């Protein structure tokens, strides 16, 4: 799928992270937005999964928009693998999502709240999940999401690998990650500058009555 789309050279984060993840190691990957982080964790997850119809990997995202985006890219990356990649996120019909899950799923992409809801309702079994990934991990491990992430993690006794990817990793986030990572390999891209387009700035003076 990758070569057919014209991909010939991996980005730095892909070049550094994919071989390590393929070996089954836990990975903390840091690179700027737009550097190919999704493929960096998505390719090893796809390669490790089989079209069994049972959840083997789960990727958590902070927003439903990102969950949809990640799922679409994974679907593109898998090519003819035949994997079922499903999304679960809030703000949509939960019964419809439950029916979709019943048809079978190999890789799940979702938001923490809806994943927990689906699990507690019996629609999503996390016990056989072997690969666990946090996208935008800096947001996923802040104080707002951390309890939910930890709850989900505790439902995965079969977990073999944890992948964390983000553009930034404050020290408190790295400390939180120690709760559920096993001797992770840190992959930090050298190209972390934020690309900011040129912006025309101007000022408008208004009278005191306004």
Segments (PLM) and residue ranges:
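Conserved pre-motif I regulatory segment
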Residues: 1-30
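Short conserved AdoMet
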Residues: 22, 50, 102, 157-158, ...
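Conserved phosphate-coupling serine/threonine residues in phosphotransfer and NTP-handling enzymes
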Residues: 11, 33-35, 62-63, 111, ...
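Short glycine-rich anion-binding loops that position phosphate/pyrophosphate groups of nucleotides
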Residues: 34, 113-115, 138-139
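Conserved nucleic-acid-binding Ia/Ib motif block in the N-terminal RecA-like helicase ATPase lobe
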Residues: 4-7, 53-120, 128-131, 174-178, ...
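Short hydrophobic/aromatic beta-strand immediately N-terminal to the Walker A/P-loop
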Residues: 28-30, 58, 163
